[in-house]
Amino acid sequence: MSSVSGVRTPRERRSALRSLLRKRRQRELASKVASTVNGATSANNHGEPPSPADARPRLTLHDLHDIFREHPELELKYLNMMKMAITGKESICLPFNFHSHRQHTCLDISPYGNEQVSRIACTSCEDNRILPTASDAMVAFINQTSNIMKNRNFYYGFCKSSELLKLSTNQPPIFQIYYLLHAANHDIVPFMHAEDGRLHMHVIFENPDVHIPCDCITQMLTAAREDYSVTLNIVRDHVVISVLCHAVSASSVKIDVTILQRKIDEMDIPNDVSESFERYKELIQELCQSSGNNLYEEATSSYAIRSPLTASPLHVVSTNGCGPSSSSQSTPPHLHPPSQATQPHHYSHHQSQSQQHHHRPQSPPPPLFLNSIRAP
């Protein structure tokens, strides 16, 4: 009837209108995609980002949904390009090497799981919070003699050792990494020790829930370069970041060690700091020993050391997941053993035997923290 009279029925008019709207929507989407690609191409050709006046509108989620509905093959390509799960989270294994960190992801460590979280999906980061950069940390390193009290938590970790402090002035990344971590997490306890003339740092987080923003991680890696390995692990139920030096690069920055040492000697160590080192004494001893094993690339899976302050052996578990060993070995070089007169015969005999069988290179022993730190 409609073909005879030349008048369309309401159903035909609605069908034609839907067809027209569909074609118009497809043309608009195609023009958006083409303008986005052309804008990116022109920016790459000139080596500069497009100016705000030339900026093109970005595709919305609704636009992507319409495109994928019309072209399912593009949806598959888009999913193959994604390196993280759609949820924006990815579990990590410990110990975690920061050099394997994915860009633009934060770290969430808690008793419920350890994950890398995409920055856009992170609920802990604040948009208006500005963290320092590696350059800011270098400026703070240069001006540290004028900001002793501001960075006093860092100097407590030296236990007033002039040898360790002198090494730190030739290794700016140690201070830089601490400075960046402290800006993101204030409840940390750093301490230093030396192996073969190289300074290393371990940072203990006092809270079980730790969030490290992606900007902080990026700046830490910038400061560390290839000379330092930065790893995160959980040791004795505490989150620990270890910064181990592999090579000392020549630094053009010179710090007056005499002035720095004099100001640090004038500082009093608070009671709570002494108590924290007393509380972490076994953890500190374990980290010093395990870092020495990593640097010397020993294949020892587990060992036990005898603490000079306690009569019972201190079992140390290696970071590779093996259980504690029941056998005891010689006291590590950084733990001062008791005098020969107070040692039992079987302990002296065992120590002499272990020294004959183990020819480990000698290095400058770091101070024993528990003997160095005492409340005023």
UniProtKB/Swiss-Prot annotation:
Gene Ontology molecular function: zinc ion binding
Documented effect of changing H211A: Partial relocalization in the host nucleoplasm
ZnF (CCCH-type) ranges: 106-211
Effect of C125S: Partial relocalization in the host nucleoplasm
Localization annotation: Host nucleus inner membrane
A single Gene Ontology CC term: membrane
Self-association and partners: Forms a heterohexameric complex with NEC2. Interacts with capsid vertex specific component 2/CVC2; this interaction directs the capsid to the host inner nuclear membrane to initiate budding.
Gene coding for it: NEC1
Name of the molecule in the record: Nuclear egress protein 1
Keyword Metal-binding: yes
Protein family according to the UniProt entry: Belongs to the herpesviridae NEC1 protein family.
Function, in words: Plays an essential role in virion nuclear egress, the first step of virion release from infected cell. Within the host nucleus, NEC1 interacts with the newly formed capsid through the vertexes and directs it to the inner nuclear membrane by associating with NEC2. Induces the budding of the capsid at the inner nuclear membrane as well as its envelopment into the perinuclear space.
Record PTM text: Phosphorylated at serine residues in the N-terminus. This phosphorylation regulates the localization within the inner nuclear membrane. Phosphorylation by viral kinase UL97 at Ser-19 plays an important role for correct viral nuclear egress complex (NEC) localization.
Region (Disordered): 22-57, 316-376
A family per Pfam: Herpes_UL31
GO biological process: viral budding from nuclear membrane
Bias kind Polar residues: ranges: 33-45, 317-332
